[in-house]
Regions:
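A short hydrophobic/small-residue beta-strand
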Residues: 15, 40, 122-123, 129
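Electropositive phosphate-/nucleotide-binding environments in soluble metabolic enzymes
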Residues: 2, 78, 82, 109, ...
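Acidic, divalent-metal-coordinating active-site segment for phosphoryl/phosphodiester hydrolysis
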Residues: 106-118
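Short Gly/Pro-enriched loop/turn and capping motifs at secondary-structure junctions
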Residues: 69-71, 106-109, 129-130
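Conserved, mostly hydrophobic/aromatic
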Residues: 8, 63, 88, 104, ...
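C-terminal helical cap(s) of enzyme catalytic domains, especially alpha/beta-barrels
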Residues: 33, 116, 128-152
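Expand to "…catalyze enediolate/carbanion chemistry for C-C bond making/breaking, isomerization
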Residues: 24, 28-31, 96, 108, ...
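Conserved anion-binding
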Residues: 3-7, 13-100
């Protein structure tokens, strides 16, 4: 992935997200992203234990919890990922860290609200928004569902 960092930075990317499943490459990739002056995101796939991200939490700006297996849109939300979001939020509070928690995959009004209650801050929604006839209304409804789930 590092071959794309500089072109993305030059194109105006503010943040670059790498997968924790890259293992021993993670520290050097984080460093390369930071050298470019960009925010660092770390993604975790559904089958990977949340503990895999623990060594990097103080080095990242965003934790992206994948709530579907990456590869194609329209998949159903994997509810077993909710405890990962809860744990990530607990660690953020316990360690006084400031990374954002984002979720990607199967996000609907219902699952978005569930993720918000679990501690997610941002939501990546595809099919539930772009598969509707009225995008503006769908976005408004998702925002309302999330904000009602966790009054801030």
């Amino acid at each position: 992935p590092e071959i794309l960092f500089e072109p993305f930075a030059k194109a105006g990317a503010d943040e670059m997200i790498i997968h924790v499943e890259l293992g021993e490459q993670i520290p050097s990739l984080i460093k390369e992203i930071k050298v470019l002056g960009k925010e660092v995101g770390l993604a975790i796939n559904p089958p990977t234990a949340i503990a895999a991200v623990l060594p990097y939490l103080d080095q990242i700006d965003l934790l992206l919890v994948m709530t579907v297996n990456p590869g194609f849109g329209g998949q159903e939300f994997i509810r077993e990922c909710l405890p990962k979001i809860q744990q990530a939020a607990a660690w953020r509070n316990e360690k006084a860290l400031s990374y954002r928690i984002s979720v990607d995959g199967g996000i609907t009004n219902e699952t978005g609200a569930d993720c918000a209650r679990a501690g997610a801050d941002t939501f990546v929604a595809g099919t539930s928004l772009f598969g509707t006839r009225n995008l503006k209304s769908a976005v408004t409804q998702l925002r309302q569902s999330v904000s009602e789930a966790v009054p801030r």
